[in-house]
Regions:
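Catalytic lumenal/periplasmic loop and adjoining terminal transmembrane helix
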Residues: 29-36, 84, 257-260, 265-274, ...
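Membrane-interface transmembrane helices that cradle and orient dolichyl/undecaprenyl
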Residues: 129-131, 170-187, 197, 221
Length: 563
């Protein structure tokens, strides 16, 4: 059983400010969610959701629903859970699947944002339960919410960002399970949250597994129950913990339609597929070179983390690690009892978050795992890294105990840094997801940027605004233009024609090529002239419009209109 709350200061103000911050984010998100373009994976994710929804509806209600010709049983992506995306298709169903394409994807943007906002709320509640006072919890909430890459991606990235939010749910579920141990209504709630997390990404099984392992370690070693109650009591406790784990597996099957027909077989297939994932054979641009996704250098993830996380976050993460190292050095003569004290007290949350943050990265490096663009597939470790940083902040404040002005300067500096990030987000909107820290910004041309091809939407809208021709003929250019179709109003979509070619012929009369900066920015296309560059507010190049020379001369006299 967990002891009484460790909150030393129960000030009302941090909780009020946290509620106001979440409300402000909700208002801002409500009025900006339509500002973001449509990315390449959004259409794929919707297709997966339709296939799962069709199967679930037919299985539960015995009625046909013709949404896709692809049966779920043989669908290649059936092991990717989409339960948290189902409500968007339910809304489509209520309208008879007659919603305009743009409204469908804007609904998904809003829903993704709301899921991420719920993750932020759960993260704050988790921090309240594991840190020494609520001011640290408020700081953690703002550090996570105002991380620029996350703010921009929480509308369009319905996979990685939703999984990040689900991991925040899982952190809270872990805290609730330990605080209310033995109360099955809390175990059921935690099992459901764990199941939704694992449904979103199979690595979500890490949280209930760590919880089970901790309970066994606690009852068997740290506070051995068999010393007082004998082996029978220990095995009774072990059975109870195993039952909680089994409850989570049952919930996972219930929320995963693809597992309904054969749960055990599906679980085995899922673990086999993702233990050696090598389906994706794309290429990644990293530090000026192209690599296959399954042959990246070992330092790929560490470098991306160091270039795209604010430097002051990294500094406090190092402070947290330094504080832990200092504790180990101080306790080296009585390390066993010190570790026991840590694992039974607030320090266990530092250990948990450190494991969740380090283990997946270490596994990816050691197993040479296939990795996608950037580090988006590891976004779920960021809340845990924030917790490590918060322990660093807490350690520094303890070092400054009794020194009023240094503590005030540190607190004021943190507030100023967070305010600066909020201003940066507003300045870069709607391209805040391309954030790099000053070191990363200095070498941005050596890294992938718009690998989601989101800027294509803005570029097509710009072409439609400038060129009033009846037909706007585009090159497909790595399929990036097709998702943008779903953003266009019907009258605009009727003007746009897309061809799978980079060359003008009678059969492929393309006038425009949109080149996204997913690699070197020196792309050239014979017979086409670069006419417009889309850049972020900080000057980072996102994409370039190329126009066929003859069309440029005919429509604009050889000079693209400057606005």
């Amino acid at each position: 059983m967990e002891h009484a709350s460790i909150l030393a200061r129960k000030s009302f103000w941090p909780r009020l400010l946290a509620a106001l911050a979440l409300l402000a984010m909700l208002i801002v998100g409500r009025y900006t969610y339509r500002d973001y373009g449509i990315t390449v994976d959004e259409t794929v994710e919707r297709d997966s959701t339709l296939i799962n929804y069709q199967y679930a509806f037919q299985t539960l209600f015995g009625r046909d629903l013709s949404l896709s010709d692809q049966p779920l049983e043989t669908y290649k992506d059936r092991h990717y859970g989409v339960t948290l995306q189902m409500p968007t298709v339910m809304v489509e169903h209520l309208t008879g699947f007659t919603m305009p394409s743009r409204d469908i994807y804007m609904l998904r943007h809003l829903w993704t944002f709301l899921l991420c906002l719920s993750g932020l709320a759960c993260f704050y509640l988790f921090l309240e339960r594991v840190l020494s006072n609520r001011w640290y919890a408020l700081l953690g909430l703002l550090m996570l919410a105002l991380y620029p890459r996350f703010w921009g991606e929480q509308f369009t990235n319905i996979k990685d960002m939703v999984f990040m939010a689900a991991c925040c749910w899982a952190l809270l579920a872990t805290a609730l399970s330990l605080r209310h141990e033995g109360k099955w209504r809390w175990e059921i709630l935690s099992a459901l949250l764990f199941a939704l997390c694992a449904n979103t990404r199979v690595i979500g099984f890490l949280f209930p597994s760590l919880l089970f392992g901790y309970r066994v370690l606690r009852d068997g070693v740290l506070t051995p129950v068999w010393k007082k109650g004998g082996a029978r009591r220990f095995f009774a406790q072990l059975a109870k913990h195993a039952l909680a784990l089994l409850l989570m597996l049952v919930c996972y099957v219930l929320v995963t339609p693809a597992a309904w027909a054969s749960p055990l077989t599906f679980l085995i297939e899922t673990f086999q597929e993702f233990s050696n994932y090598n389906i994706w054979n794309g290429t990644v641009y990293f530090l000026g070179d192209w690599y296959s996704g399954n042959a990246l250098p070992w330092y790929y993830l560490p470098v991306w983390l160091c270039l795209s996380i604010p430097l002051w976050y990294l500094a406090f993460m190092l402070a947290g690690a330094a504080g832990a190292a200092a504790f180990v050095l101080r306790s080296r003569r009585r390390l066993g009892s010190a570790l026991r004290r840590v694992l039974l007290g607030p320090g266990r949350w530092f250990v948990l978050c450190l494991i969740v943050a380090v283990l997946p990265v270490a596994a990816a490096i050691l197993m040479h795992s296939t990795l996608y663009n950037g580090w988006r597939h590891m976004y779920f470790i960021f809340p845990e890294l924030v917790v490590v940083a918060l322990f660093g902040v807490q350690w520094l404040f303890r070092l400054l105990r009794g020194r009023r002005w240094p503590r005030r300067i540190l607190a004021g500096g943190l507030a100023a840094l967070l305010a600066g990030q909020a201003c940066w987000i507003g300045w870069m909107h709607p391209f805040e997801k391309f954030y790099l820290n000053p070191v990363g910004q200095s070498m941005c041309d050596l890294l992938e940027k718009d690998y989601w091809y989101e800027s294509t939407t803005a570029q097509i809208l710009h072409i439609l605004e400038v060129d009033d021709s009846r037909r706007i003929c585009l090159s497909v250019n790595a399929f990036s233009s097709i998702p943008a179709f779903n953003y266009l109003a019907a009258k605009d979509a009727r003007r746009v024609y897309i061809y799978d070619s980079y060359t003008y012929t009678d059969w492929t009369p393309i006038d425009y090529i949109i080149d996204e900066s997913c690699g070197p920015v020196s792309s050239t296309f014979p017979g086409f002239t670069p006419v417009y560059e889309l850049r972020c507010a900080n000057g980072m190049l996102l994409s370039t419009i190329y126009m066929r020379d003859e069309a440029l001369a005919e429509r604009f006299g050889g000079q693209w209109p400057q606005q």
